[in-house]
Amino acid sequence: MKILVVQGAGMNMRGKVQTEIFGTMTLDEYNQHILKYAAELEIDVEIFHSNIEGEVINRLYEANDQGFDGALVNPAGYSRGYPALTAAISQVKFPVIEVHISNPVRRGPVSDTATVSLGMVTGFGVLGYYLALRGLRDTRKGR
């Protein structure tokens, strides 16, 4: 099973700013935890980060063409007001689970991208990625 993990706009600032909301873990630390847990689940994971919406959209379409089995997307700064990203998520053949380190609903309306995602995991920090990986794996295996 091959899963794309997309880390959206501003994720490179995790652990550096707004630590009262997002904690002190950096993007690199999150990615290392994700890779380690995915290996335990025998899931092949590719992690992609960009602060440029078009690059994220292109990577999702490429993953679609490359036969990926699913994606975890932390839209971060792309959560609201990015209709092209929302459209891209709705157009790929594989399921997408949206992940947020914190609970964004506590700070405002739900994300636009969540409306086209299979599911959403919020507020559990790095554990949210673990839950989403397991959920995606089990959903794809029909469990």
For the regions a language model picked out, list residue spans one by one:
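Extreme N-terminal starter segment of soluble prokaryotic enzymes
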Residues: 1-4
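Short, glycine-/small-residue-rich phosphate/pyrophosphate-handling segment
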Residues: 105-143
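Short, well-structured alpha-helical segments in soluble
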Residues: 58-67
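Mid-chain, well-packed structural core segment of small domains
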Residues: 67-104
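Short hydrophobic segments within beta-strands
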Residues: 6-9
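Glycine- and acidic-residue-enriched helix-capping/strand-helix junction motifs
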Residues: 14-29
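Short acidic active-site motifs
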Residues: 55-59, 81
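Short beta->alpha junction loops
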Residues: 46-54
